[in-house]
Design a protein with these regions (language model features):
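Alpha-helical scaffold segments
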Residues: 1-111
Length: 111
Protein backbone atom coordinates (compact mmCIF):
# COMPACT_ATOMS: atom_id res chain seq x y z
CA UNK A 1 0.00 0.00 0.00
CA UNK A 2 1.40 3.38 -1.02
CA UNK A 3 1.58 6.13 1.55
CA UNK A 4 1.21 8.96 -0.94
CA UNK A 5 4.52 10.47 0.15
CA UNK A 6 6.20 9.73 -3.17
CA UNK A 7 9.96 10.34 -3.08
CA UNK A 8 9.65 11.43 0.56
CA UNK A 9 8.59 7.92 1.57
CA UNK A 10 10.88 5.64 3.55
CA UNK A 11 9.47 2.76 1.50
CA UNK A 12 12.12 2.20 -1.19
CA UNK A 13 9.64 0.86 -3.75
CA UNK A 14 7.40 3.91 -3.45
CA UNK A 15 10.25 6.43 -3.27
CA UNK A 16 12.15 5.01 -6.25
CA UNK A 17 8.99 4.62 -8.35
CA UNK A 18 8.25 8.30 -7.84
CA UNK A 19 11.81 9.37 -8.70
CA UNK A 20 11.64 7.33 -11.93
CA UNK A 21 8.76 9.54 -13.07
CA UNK A 22 10.59 12.83 -12.42
CA UNK A 23 12.68 14.56 -15.09
CA UNK A 24 12.92 18.11 -13.72
CA UNK A 25 16.55 18.76 -12.70
CA UNK A 26 15.59 21.13 -9.88
CA UNK A 27 13.28 18.52 -8.38
CA UNK A 28 15.93 15.81 -8.76
CA UNK A 29 18.44 18.10 -7.04
CA UNK A 30 16.00 18.59 -4.17
CA UNK A 31 15.45 14.84 -3.92
CA UNK A 32 19.20 14.18 -3.80
CA UNK A 33 19.47 16.41 -0.75
CA UNK A 34 16.14 15.82 0.97
CA UNK A 35 14.92 12.27 0.32
CA UNK A 36 14.90 10.11 3.42
CA UNK A 37 15.39 6.95 1.38
CA UNK A 38 18.96 6.37 0.15
CA UNK A 39 17.77 4.59 -3.00
CA UNK A 40 15.74 7.65 -3.97
CA UNK A 41 18.79 9.88 -3.44
CA UNK A 42 20.96 7.52 -5.47
CA UNK A 43 18.53 7.41 -8.38
CA UNK A 44 18.10 11.19 -8.40
CA UNK A 45 21.87 11.61 -8.59
CA UNK A 46 22.17 9.10 -11.42
CA UNK A 47 19.36 10.75 -13.37
CA UNK A 48 21.02 14.16 -13.06
CA UNK A 49 24.37 12.74 -14.21
CA UNK A 50 26.36 15.52 -12.53
CA UNK A 51 29.79 14.06 -11.71
CA UNK A 52 30.56 16.85 -9.23
CA UNK A 53 27.43 16.07 -7.24
CA UNK A 54 28.17 12.36 -7.41
CA UNK A 55 31.66 13.03 -6.08
CA UNK A 56 30.28 15.11 -3.23
CA UNK A 57 27.76 12.43 -2.26
CA UNK A 58 30.37 9.67 -2.64
CA UNK A 59 32.35 11.41 0.08
CA UNK A 60 29.69 12.74 2.41
CA UNK A 61 26.29 11.07 2.18
CA UNK A 62 25.15 9.69 5.52
CA UNK A 63 24.31 6.35 3.89
CA UNK A 64 27.05 3.91 2.90
CA UNK A 65 24.65 2.65 0.22
CA UNK A 66 24.72 6.00 -1.56
CA UNK A 67 28.47 6.48 -1.08
CA UNK A 68 29.19 2.97 -2.37
CA UNK A 69 27.04 3.38 -5.47
CA UNK A 70 28.27 6.90 -6.25
CA UNK A 71 31.94 5.90 -6.06
CA UNK A 72 31.26 3.45 -8.91
CA UNK A 73 30.35 6.42 -11.13
CA UNK A 74 33.51 8.44 -10.47
CA UNK A 75 36.36 8.90 -12.96
CA UNK A 76 38.76 10.86 -10.74
CA UNK A 77 41.50 8.39 -9.78
CA UNK A 78 42.85 10.52 -6.93
CA UNK A 79 39.40 10.94 -5.39
CA UNK A 80 38.54 7.26 -5.73
CA UNK A 81 41.88 6.35 -4.14
CA UNK A 82 41.17 8.77 -1.26
CA UNK A 83 37.77 7.16 -0.65
CA UNK A 84 39.28 3.65 -0.89
CA UNK A 85 41.78 4.57 1.80
CA UNK A 86 39.68 6.73 4.10
CA UNK A 87 35.95 5.98 4.09
CA UNK A 88 34.59 4.83 7.44
CA UNK A 89 32.61 1.97 5.88
CA UNK A 90 34.39 -1.18 4.70
CA UNK A 91 31.91 -1.80 1.86
CA UNK A 92 32.51 1.71 0.50
CA UNK A 93 36.29 1.24 0.71
CA UNK A 94 35.99 -2.09 -1.12
CA UNK A 95 33.79 -0.60 -3.83
CA UNK A 96 36.24 2.29 -4.25
CA UNK A 97 39.17 -0.14 -4.46
CA UNK A 98 37.38 -2.08 -7.21
CA UNK A 99 36.60 1.13 -9.11
CA UNK A 100 40.20 2.29 -8.65
CA UNK A 101 41.52 -0.94 -10.15
CA UNK A 102 39.14 -0.54 -13.09
CA UNK A 103 40.18 3.07 -13.68
CA UNK A 104 43.87 2.16 -13.49
CA UNK A 105 43.39 -0.66 -16.03
CA UNK A 106 41.53 1.74 -18.33
CA UNK A 107 44.24 4.38 -18.04
CA UNK A 108 46.87 1.74 -18.85
CA UNK A 109 44.90 0.78 -21.97
CA UNK A 110 44.06 -2.71 -20.77
CA UNK A 111 40.31 -2.34 -21.30
Amino acid sequence: MRSGLGWRSLNPVEAVADVHSIENKDTLFRIAYEARNPEARRLALLKMGDKRLMAAFAQSDCSPIVRRLMVRELDDIALVRHIAENDDDRSVRESAAQRLAQLERESAGQI
